[in-house]
């Protein structure tokens, strides 16, 4: 089988990244599916086309995200999403021929039934073989910084729906922790930052704002936002400083700093003092799209009292790690 017919996917709640083995191109797909509102729902669009309707979908359609909190929330939709990506990036293959091999990232805290659900989903999408790789192992392999593989590396991956941290050595995850929260604001990932900011804006200025504006504020692309004041019954514009943003999301930053401290302590207990020695030499590595939040690295450094390094392109670390792991096979 041609190696180019092997697909690597970093499956995320907000974004999914896709690479073909032997091809340097990287596809970024919003993890969104647009369906009709009737039952059973009909798929109308997948990816960017669906994501564009998230803020103001018409009454007769729904925009859904099959992946949530590191789990497949809607298996049927996820399978159709996979089939769409297959056709887009592989082209059509006449049935009943099987599609090629698939390697997927999976959260380290995933239960056996959750891993089986991912494997079953891949097979239902007609992949011949499905392999799962722990996300933290992929993130560690994707780091540009050269850490000897036999040294323990502390990796903190901050995604949209959840944050996880672990100690990785020789491609194996030795210890790991994940922050899940039923209430998004109680989490430690990108969605928690968004909700915390939105709540702070509403409490401070009495304004209701859309998710797209909060996301731009979070990424540092804008400091002025327009929101609707229910009390004054009009739209108002306010300017928000970086210092205000940092203060607003401080609860989320504190949970991430605590996660770092806990996973280092876990590593020392299970692996030994070599974990602290490696952290002193190389630092704790922040990866994932949520790691780009301004002030996060400094806050963790000052609160957890450890050196911190931000991956060069944190949102692509896991998919690049899958490429490197596959190249070693």
Predicted regions and their residues:
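Nucleotide/phosphate-binding catalytic cleft detector across ATP-hydrolyzing
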Residues: 1-29, 34-42, 48-156, 168-284, ...
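Gly/Ser-rich catalytic serine loop of serine hydrolases
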Residues: 159-162
């Amino acid at each position: 089988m041609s190696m180019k017919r092997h697909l690597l996917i970093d499956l995320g709640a907000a974004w999914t990244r896709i690479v073909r083995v032997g091809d340097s191109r990287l596809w970024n797909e919003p993890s969104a599916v647009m369906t009709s509102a009737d039952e059973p729902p009909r798929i109308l669009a997948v990816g960017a086309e669906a994501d564009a309707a998230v803020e103001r979908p018409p009454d007769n359609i729904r925009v859904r995200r099959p992946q949530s909190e590191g789990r497949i929330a809607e298996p049927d939709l996820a399978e159709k999403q996979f089939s769409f990506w297959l056709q887009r990036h592989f082209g059509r293959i006449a049935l009943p021929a099987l599609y090629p091999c698939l390697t997927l990232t999976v959260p380290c805290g995933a239960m056996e039934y959750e891993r089986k659900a991912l494997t079953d989903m891949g097979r239902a999408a007609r992949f011949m073989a499905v392999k799962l790789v722990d996300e933290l192992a992929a993130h560690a392999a994707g780091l540009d910084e050269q850490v000897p593989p036999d040294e323990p590396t502390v990796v903190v991956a901050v995604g949209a729906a959840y944050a996880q941290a672990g100690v990785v050595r020789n491609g194996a995850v030795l210890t790991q922790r994940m922050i899940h929260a039923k209430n998004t604001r109680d989490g430690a990932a990108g969605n928690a930052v968004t909700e915390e900011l939105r709540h702070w804006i509403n409490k401070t200025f009495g304004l209701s704002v859309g998710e797209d504006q909060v996301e731009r504020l979070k990424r540092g692309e804008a400091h002025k936002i327009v929101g609707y004041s229910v009390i004054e019954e009009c739209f108002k514009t306010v300017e928000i400083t970086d210092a205000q943003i940092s203060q607003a999301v401080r609860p989320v930053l504190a949970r991430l700093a605590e996660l770092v401290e806990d996973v280092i302590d876990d590593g020392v207990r299970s692996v030994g003092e070599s974990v602290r020695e490696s952290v002193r030499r190389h630092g704790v590595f922040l990866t994932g799209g949520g790691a780009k939040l301004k002030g996060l690295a400094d806050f963790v450094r000052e609160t957890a009292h450890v050196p911190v390094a931000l991956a060069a392109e944190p949102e692509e670390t896991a998919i690049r790690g899958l490429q490197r792991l596959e190249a070693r096979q």
